[in-house]
Amino acid sequence: MITPFHHTPRLPFAPTPIGNPSLTLPPRPQQTMTGKSSHKAPDLPRGLNFYADYSGCGHWRMIWPELLLNCYGKANIQGGTVMIGDKNFYQGVKTVRIQRQATESQANYIKWLSQLSKELNFKIIYEIDDIIFKEDIPHYNKFRFAFEDPKIRQTSMEIMQLCDEITVTNKFMQNYYIEKTGNKNVTVVPNFIPKLWMDRYFDLAKVKDNYQRNKKRPRVVYCGSGAHFDIENRIKQKDDFYHINDVIRKTVDKFQWVFVGGFPLTLRDLIQQKKIEYHEWTNLVDYPEYINRMNPTVFYAPLEDSNFNKAKSDLKFIEGCALGIPTICQDLCTYSTAFHKFKTGDDLVSKIEYLTNDYKKYTKEVKRARDYMKSRWMEDNINFYTELYSFPYGDPKRKNLNRLNGIS
């Protein structure tokens, strides 16, 4: 156990006593005390996280890595949303990591922090897992309004240019932010899933049984944010589902289409008629169990071809792999890791048929998906984050990060 309430981490317990006079056993031979503790505090990097949110993004990119680094004793990380202006708080800190900061007051804080970092010798990392420049945010995205103010763009850019490093989720986003900001120190840190959150819900026997029970009408499930749908009809439903809505309608009796979290407005009539299932979103804690209870035969993840979507991570693919469910993903660089991809609605239907028309083939794909997760559990990849908080950009000790990012 490490306590952060000092300039450097301290072990909050006393050295082992030389002997206990209340015991009947012979005491240990006395040793000469040197004044040094027999328990040396481990040399852990101390870091600070400043979150922009406590929802999915905050957990995937900040809170879960922080939790596991602390639990494994890999680092000593404190997180929160309050920006602290007492310089003594930053004594002994190696890294300050800030998530998606964009306002004028946040920019002023980062300017002060940047000056302090030179005095106290710590680095500042800007974490971003989405595109935040208005020209590349789709008009159907319900959160676009938050980035329409030119001042937000200006301050976001200024903050990213001040930071020593930017962390992103994929190669496309890496190149995007290098080009937009001029900051060359942009590092890809993929999304990883915590075992403690999602691992326990895989059950091969259940997946096989579900396949057999729904063989005549496979359950084709989509789980995702309402930001993928043109819910305000701004651009006549030309959203992430525009290119597949027709085939969903045509195959509504062949497949049991299931939507979780949102649905295309053009399919509202089929939902009202109960021909398509719709389920409300749930909280982050219950999410794995919730989507597992949808009894999916396959998952699918459509996206419009845009810079915004190319900068997305492969979350939907690895969520499917964690549950052992084959997942069919849009054929974009976003899902370069995916096993099954589609371009058009007809492609999607063909992939569904391919995966669901043979029990042995389906079982093989289930095991293949699950095997892939061996490389994407957060606990097994925590050293990516240990390196991130411990060493500066490009340092040879960043073996995992350098290998992934092509730094020799």
Where are these regions (language model features)?
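N-terminal pre-catalytic "stem/leader" segment of glycosyltransferase-like enzymes
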Residues: 2-104
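Donor nucleotide-sugar binding/catalytic pocket of nucleotide-sugar-dependent glycosyltransferases
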Residues: 164-178, 182-204, 219, 223
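Acceptor-binding helix/loop patch of EC 2.4 sugar-transfer enzymes
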Residues: 126-153, 196-205, 213-216, 225-227, ...
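Membrane-proximal helix-turn-helix segments that form the acceptor-binding/catalytic region
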Residues: 114-119, 146-166
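Conserved catalytic-core segment of nucleotide-activated headgroup transferases in glycan assembly
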Residues: 53-68, 74, 192-294
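A charged, aromatic-enriched C-terminal amphipathic alpha-helix characteristic of glycosyltransferases
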Residues: 206, 359-402
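Nucleotide-sugar-dependent
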Residues: 231-239, 285, 289-319, 329-339
